[in-house]
Structures are given as C-alpha cells and as structure tokens.
C-alpha cells in the first residue's frame, strides 16, 4: 500500500504524470472514501500546483488502468489535449501495456501463454 498516501511519481511535466501503482490500490474507484490513484494524484496536484485554483478540482484523465491486484506504471493526462493525444497513441500502437509475471516452481515448458478469464 502507499505509505502515507504519497504517490511515487516517475515522471511529471505540464501535460502528463507517470506514477507507480502499488498492488492493492485501485486505479479509479466510484466508492466515496476509497483511496485510489486518481484521488491520490489529485491531492498531489492540489498540494504542488504553483497557481492554486482552490475553487476548481485539477483535471486528471485516466489513460489506461491496471487491475487492483496488479502493480506497475500508470499514465495520466493533466490536460484535455494530452488526454486526446495519449488515447490516440494507445489505440495506434504509440505505446501500450506490457506485463511481466513472476512465478515459482518447476514448469513443464519454458514458454507459454496464460489466459485468465
């Protein structure tokens, strides 16, 4: 879990935030009071924005999600223009999600595909 709900920011500029999502933390939740990456990052933006806009919540768009049990990097857009461009890149192979699994034990095959429905 996130210690004291401080996000681990990997990269941030005026348009995007790339952060590490720990296992167990949802990317986004519709339940009031649930700590998720969206609310954690919005709090980060409120605390660290140079021009304090107290009357307006910061813009933050989820570009892709990771399941709650999964940890990894998430990309968020800080502007509508960045959200549009990143969404376009995601659908046209500009960038994507890659998974790495760690497994224990002795396996019959060195390679394979795991499908979980």
Predicted regions and their residues:
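RNA pseudouridine synthases
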Residues: 1-117
């Amino acid at each position: 879990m996130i210690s004291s709900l401080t996000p681990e920011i990997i990269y941030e500029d005026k348009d995007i935030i790339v952060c590490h999502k720990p296992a167990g933390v949802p990317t986004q939740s519709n339940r009031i009071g649930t700590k998720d990456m969206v609310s954690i990052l919005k709090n980060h933006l409120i605390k660290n924005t140079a021009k304090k806009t107290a009357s307006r919540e910061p813009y933050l768009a989820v570009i892709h999600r990771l399941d709650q049990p999964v940890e990894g990097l998430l990309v968020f857009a800080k502007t509508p223009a960045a959200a549009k461009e990143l969404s376009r890149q995601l659908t046209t192979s500009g960038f994507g999600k890659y998974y790495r699994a760690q497994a224990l034990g002795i396996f019959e095959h060195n390679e394979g595909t795991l499908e979980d429905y």
